Swiss-Prot record:
Protein name: G-protein coupled receptor 4
Organism: Xenopus tropicalis
Keywords: Cell membrane, Disulfide bond, G-protein coupled receptor, Glycoprotein, Membrane, Receptor, Transducer, Transmembrane, Transmembrane helix
Chief localisation class: membrane
Residues carrying a glycan: N164
Annotated transmembrane regions: 9-45, 50-80, 86-121, 130-156, 173-211, 216-251, 268-296
Effect of H165A: Decreased proton-induced G-protein coupled receptor activity
Cross-referenced InterPro entries: GPCR_Rhodpsn, GPCR_Rhodpsn_7TM, GPR4_orph
PROSITE patterns assigned: G_PROTEIN_RECEP_F1_1, G_PROTEIN_RECEP_F1_2
Consequence of changing H276A: Decreased proton-induced G-protein coupled receptor activity
Length: 353
């Protein structure tokens, strides 16, 4: 079933067929292999009994779920906000997409908190960081996020208007006061709370590093980059979308919570292109997370390098065989030139904090 909105705002979908599909295609193409590799590397950390690997594994899993939901949303934007897969698919892909935006933010804050406890209080909270505790925290996050994002599944998934839009999981103006209040809650609990935790952990890590004489300068820089990178990535990726979502919701509530088109539509129509662009920008977090993983687990970089080196070696070996079958010299290069096969390895040391 769908809901027809007779007094809908006349939003312009002209830019929707350009920026969001381009970003989604980029995230899908690069993010899928990167997060599969990060998922495998995080699993290796879990097998070694490292609690940080649990959070990174769940972060990669969340990113992969979001990435897998992108193809139908790409088609939605290419059609200029016309959902063509029915209300059931809209609920499914909308739920997966929006839930994993907030699951990702929650696990970024877990990584920050874990690094803070490891550096600032390694002996004071020994029971807070075993792998079973990390698994319990992860399960709690999934349950809370799934429950918090479930209510929209019970309402109307699709909203049609007289401007030939078939919106999925969104409407312009907002569908009611309850939706506006829920949006404010998402901004506060789903974005600002995790981001605040990251900032507090960053400040605490800086204090702990200044007071530590045993930590090498190189490791100080790495921990500092990780501690700053987490809140910066969250702010740059999630911040614009949540700022516009909060603005839309507050204006709607201040205006009396009416769904009638009127003064509120002027704001909705102005914000619409930036709002959809900011939502697409939020998915770039799926590309940043694997890079942050390498900062969080320097020992795993060698494992990742081995896989990449193996793939490169396999590809180059395949090219050599193909060249030989075509009558070449079997080297895969020109005459008198050989390929130097480089085996990529880690630096042989790990710094576990």
């Amino acid at each position: 079933m769908s809901n027809f909105t007779p007094d809908a705002c006349n939003v312009d979908s002209g830019l929707d067929s350009v920026l969001p599909p381009s970003l989604y295609a980029l995230v899908f193409t690069l993010g899928l292999p990167a997060n599969l590799l990060a998922l495998w590397a995080a699993w290796l950390q879990v097998r070694k009994g490292r609690e940080l690997g649990v959070y990174l594994l769940n972060l990669s899993l969340s990113d992969l779920l979001l990435i897998c939901a992108l193809p139908p949303w790409t088609d939605y934007y290419l059609r200029r906000d016309v959902w063509g897969y029915g209300p059931g698919a809209c609920r499914l892909f909308g739920f997966v997409f929006y839930t994993n935006l907030y699951v990702g933010a929650a696990f970024l804050s877990c990584v920050s908190a874990d690094r803070y406890l490891a550096v600032a209080h390694p002996l004071r909270f020994p029971g807070a960081r075993p792998i079973r505790s990390a698994a319990a925290v992860s399960a709690l996050i999934w349950m809370l996020e799934l429950a918090a994002n479930a209510p929209p599944l019970l309402g109307e998934a699709i909203h049609r208007d007289r401007y030939n839009h078939t919106f999925c999981y969104e409407s312009y103006p907002l569908s009611g006061r309850g939706a506006a209040l829920a949006n404010v809650g998402r901004v506060l609990a789903g974005f600002l709370l995790p981001w605040g935790v990251m900032m507090l952990c960053y400040a605490g890590l800086l204090r702990a590093l200044r007071g530590s004489a045993s930590c090498e300068q190189r490791e100080r820089r790495r921990v500092r980059r990780l501690a700053l990178g987490l809140p910066c990535v969250a702010l740059l990726c999630y911040g614009p979308y949540h700022a516009l979502l909060l603005l839309r919701s507050l204006v709607f509530l201040v205006g009396g919570g009416s769904v009638d088109a009127g003064g509120g539509c002027a704001l909705e129509e102005r914000l619409f292109p930036a709002y959809h662009a900011s939502l697409a920008l939020a998915t770039l977090n799926c590309l940043a997370d694997p890079a942050l993983y390498c900062l969080a687990c320097p020992g795993a970089r060698g494992e990742v390098a081995k896989v990449v080196g193996g793939v490169v070696a396999w590809a180059m070996g395949k090219e050599r065989r193909a060249w030989g079958e075509r009558g070449g010299n079997g080297r895969g290069c020109g005459e008198g030139e050989e390929v130097g096969m480089v085996e990529l390895r880690g630096n042989g040391r790990e710094f576990v904090v």
